[in-house]
Amino acid sequence: MTFGFQSAVDIATQAIDCIHTTAASHGRVFIVEVMGHKVGQLTLYAGIAGGADISLIPEIPYSIDSICKAIEARNKQKKGFTILAVAEGAIPKERAEMSKKELKKFMETYQYPTVSYEIAAQLTERLGTEVRVTVPGHTQRGGSPCPYDRVLSTRLGAAAAQAIVDDDYGYMIGIVNNECVRVPLEESAGKLKFIDPNSSIISEAKMIGISFGD
């Protein structure tokens, strides 16, 4: 994880935390939209930390039917409310199967501001329940960094400065086994860290009852 990630998780988690009170008192379905067009790391971590009931991430295409079933199951258990953490790039299974050309054409007539509002409309129609959308937006990119990020940034900066002193260029400074290391740029530049749907953290999230709408 890069510096800034933990701070963003803190802010997204706080947004979910704040929604819990309103959701519980009004007995509604709430959607908290979290940043992440291509990668769902922020949504995954904030969803777990904030106690979201459903997390939708780009790496796991969702089915609106599965989401409805998850909400109905909570209603039968008298939970009273449901909170969804939805990544900006969450995508339904039918669109995930489209070609880039087909998807581009579809998006030309897309009527919703974001996917969260589309999901809200579908849930309202199918379940007859009120659904509210909250978008923390760019607040996730600002504010004061958390202590972890401050320490991480300081360590990486010091290690980068030492690389310059050593006249050793063409590297990114990373952390491996809690030690700063120099990683060749060609091994890291331009690469996204996608979530493996079969990873242990996904399995653990499912074990505690989080649905991914799959």
Model segments located where?
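Divalent-metal (Mg2+/Mn2+/Ca2+)-assisted nucleotide/phosphate chemistry catalytic cores
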Residues: 1-3
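Accessory alpha-helical/coil subdomains and C-terminal extensions
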Residues: 5-23, 33-129
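A charged, well-structured terminal subsegment
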Residues: 17-30, 163-168
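Catalytic-site beta-strand/loop segments enriched in glycine and acidic/polar residues
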Residues: 22-36, 135-136, 142
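Residue-level preference for the first positions of well-ordered beta-strands
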Residues: 28-31, 82-84, 170-172
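C-terminal non-catalytic interaction/assembly regions of soluble proteins
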Residues: 111-214
